[in-house]
Structure formats: C-alpha cells, structure tokens
Amino acid sequence: MKKVIFLIYVSLFIFNWGKAWALIEVDITRGNLNPLPLAVSPLSVDQNSKEKFKNLLKLEDIGVEISKVVENNLRQSGLFNPLDPKAFLQKPDIAHVKPRFEDWALIKAQALITGEVKIVDEKLRVEFRLWDILAGKEIMALAFTTVSENWRRVGHIITDK
C-alpha cells in the first residue's frame, strides 16, 4: 500500500513538473490606441494686432501660423488626429470665447483648442484654451507673453501643456 501511495505522489510530481516551469508567452502584434480626434481652431487675432504682426514678422496671419505648429506637433505625436479646419462650423473669434459644443460634436471632435493672439506693450500675448467637447466644459486655459520672435516657441509650449 505504501508503494502505491508513493507511486501516485511520484507520478503527480512528474506530470506537474512541466507545468510548474512552463513559460507564458504573449505576442503583442499591434496597439489598440485610436488617436483622439481634436480640432485646433486658428487663434483669433484682432485687425490692429494682425497689421502689426504682418509688418513686424512678415506673417499674413500669426494666429493661423501658431495653430499650424500646434496641429503638426499633435499629429506627429501619434496620439491625436487633428481635424481638417475646412470642416469647422464656428469662426475662431467666437469659438475662443464660448464654443458651440454641438457644432464641434457634429464633426466628431472630442477636444478643441482655441485661442487669441494680440500685442500688449509691444509684446506677443497668446491665450489658449482646451475644451472637452463631450463634457461641454473648459479643461485648461493659459496665457503667455513674450517677444514677437518667439511665436513658434509658443506653439510648441502649447503642445507640451
């Protein structure tokens, strides 16, 4: 009887030995992350500031240029899918104050970046806001003041925030 019990223990040990040392192998073939669709509205610029920037920096519309920097940075990250500005239903100067969330939801945007550019004491002042379209509320608002030549850097800083 002792031999039978011993053989049962030995056989259980031998047959389970391989399972105890088995390695789990997982193959990850692709990610499951869809880029977030967001709208980067051109930053609004009042006419007086637009003329000053045009003379100072030789740019037609500094608000559009800063928005392009932000849009390109977000696209290159792979985490965001900036929507085509031609699809936007709301004008940038109105969207900055209070976006019509229904309009942005129609074009499938889940987030919105708006802003305003102006000259204050001969310096560039950029205000930007990040909006959650689905929740219908502002997530973040920041303002930067710098020399006009740093306009591109401001676009990169907005992206980093």
Role assignments for model-derived ranges:
Residues 16-22:
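Sec/Tat signal peptide C-region and signal peptidase I cleavage site
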Residues 6, 45, 114-117:
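Hydrophobic/anchoring residues in structured secondary elements
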Residues 4-14:
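Sec-dependent N-terminal signal peptides
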Residues 22-24, 34-39, 66, 70, ...:
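Envelope-exposed proteins and targeting segments
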Residues 29-100:
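Short beta-strand->alpha-helix linker/helix-N-cap micro-motif
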